[in-house]
Design a protein with these regions (language model features):
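Intrinsic low-complexity, repeat-rich intrinsically disordered segments enriched
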Residues: 1-34
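GGW-centered surface loops in extracellular recognition modules
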Residues: 27-95
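Short aromatic-cysteine micro-motif
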Residues: 78-79, 106, 111-287
């Protein structure tokens, strides 16, 4: 008989802990253990098992099986499928910190006792896992771009993606579910599923991109990374060649959604795993192409860039430009954001396209401060552009408009410039476009 003595159980930030699914005891590590992001390059990496579930969430058959296509996937009451992304630490390689330049190592949330001990080892907890002033164990994010489901924006396979403007069909604009037809409307779109949901942040998007980068570096074949390439295209593929396929992979074929003739249905690729962030059917689909996606968390007043504070609960952010809770406007900027100045790294308001990647260091290795937060937003260092295959040569549009609303991923015709790192900073919140949609997310 074994004896277990437990004095304290708490999260690294001291917040309450509950175990509705019980506690697993054993020596297993990696995919298949609770709240574990897995091992880069291996089966199950990039998603995981949630330690508890918000109201309205349920498991799918296979949710807790790392060999399953639905591993780490959950369903909400409206039928939406969401992927659970457990919190993780990362170390971005500088060539002098134990990892080769621009190689990223990932460790699960449980690997370090606390954020401080991780930082002492050169690892940072990703910015995506801070919300409302506390460290969160993970977040759920839509597996697919949202589509109309009555009056709800749902994440379902083979949907016709909603957009901020009509795309031929009356079922495509946000207004078809009672929301505003512009980029700021994505905040209301997310809330159609419930008050605990929010529009995907730029930090959450960057976390998915970083996981794909780490997976690419560690993979040695396509067994657990379907989009793997030993040469020049080692990154997720998508609907981006204006012909329902991918500019870098001629085997990809999407099903038309019946709008433009070149826009695919959500998650409809014939090889789904080639279009997910982790190269497996369990991952988040269509981050490269299909439709641009709005994000919140980084904006501008036309003079300076502003970064959302970790103290802000993104569930409380509103879509206007006058209130202290508004994502845009002077009052909201003063209440919720930090002014990081007129430039940061490769963001210099040069009004130009800057391809992602470089032979020099691309992202900061910082474990705290502005450099850490901007790396968490997926913004490269001044040395981090010029283009490289490692980062897909994805495009960053370097602008600084007032009420900036960054778009990520690319659309159905952006070709090689689309990708998981692509970010366009030339758009404002009040704009609308038929090739710009969104995803919802929910913190645990």
């Amino acid at each position: 008989m074994s004896t277990l003595v437990v004095r304290t159980i708490q999260t690294p930030d001291g917040s309450p802990v509950s175990f509705p699914n019980g506690i697993r005891i054993g020596t297993a590590i990696g995919a298949g253990t609770m709240n574990n992001i897995g091992t880069p390059g291996q089966q199950g990496f990039g998603v995981g098992i949630a330690p508890s579930l918000p109201t309205g969430f349920s498991k799918l058959y296979g949710t807790e099986d790392p060999t399953s296509d639905t591993y780490g996937n959950y369903q909400t009451t409206d039928g939406s499928v969401m992927c659970y992304i457990p919190a993780f630490y990362y170390k971005f390689g500088t060539g002098a910190n134990g990892y080769a330049l621009n190689v990223c190592d990932i460790k699960p949330f449980s690997y370090f006792e606390a954020v401080a001990s991780a930082a002492a080892a050169g690892y940072a907890l990703h910015r995506a896992f801070y919300n409302g002033g506390s460290v969160r164990p993970g977040f759920f994010v839509d597996k697919y771009l949202v589509s109309k489901n009555g009056t709800v924006a749902s994440s379902v396979k083979n949907g016709v993606a909603l957009a901020s403007a009509t795309r031929t069909l009356a079922t495509t604009p946000y207004s078809s579910i009672g929301q505003t037809d512009n980029y700021r409307g994505s905040i209301g779109v997310a809330k159609t599923r419930g008050s605990s949901f929010h529009a995907k942040t730029i930090f959450q998007n960057s976390a998915l991109a970083l996981l794909s980068l780490a997976h690419a570096s560690a993979a040695t074949g396509s067994t657990y990374c379907a989009w793997y390439s030993a040469t020049s295209t080692n990154y997720p593929k998508g609907c981006n060649n204006a012909a329902l396929g991918d500019a870098n992979d001629a085997t990809i074929a999407y099903t038309s959604d019946g709008t433009t003739g070149v826009t695919g249905k959500t998650g409809s690729a014939n090889f789904l795993a080639k279009t997910t962030h982790n190269g497996m059917n369990s991952g988040v689909a269509d981050l490269n192409g299909l439709l641009w996606e709005t994000t919140i968390g980084l904006t501008s007043d036309g003079t300076n860039y502003y970064l959302l504070n970790t103290s802000v609960d993104v569930n409380t952010i509103t879509a206007g430009s006058t209130l202290a809770t508004d994502a845009w406007g002077a009052t909201g900027l003063a209440a919720m954001y930090t002014n990081i100045g007129a430039t940061y790294g490769a963001l210099t308001a040069s009004n130009s396209n800057k391809p992602f990647g470089s032979a020099a260091q691309v992202l900061s290795e910082a474990t705290s401060g502005t450099a850490w937060a901007m790396a968490g937003a997926g913004i490269p260092l001044a040395t981090g552009t010029g283009g490289s295959n490692q980062f897909g040569n994805d495009y960053m549009l370097d602008y600084r408009p007032a009420e900036m609303c960054p778009l990520v991923g690319g659309n159905w015709s952006n070709s090689v410039y689309a990708g998981v790192w692509a970010v366009y900073c030339n758009n404002v919140a009040g704009t609308s476009s038929d090739d710009v949609g969104c995803r919802s997310a929910c913190y645990l």
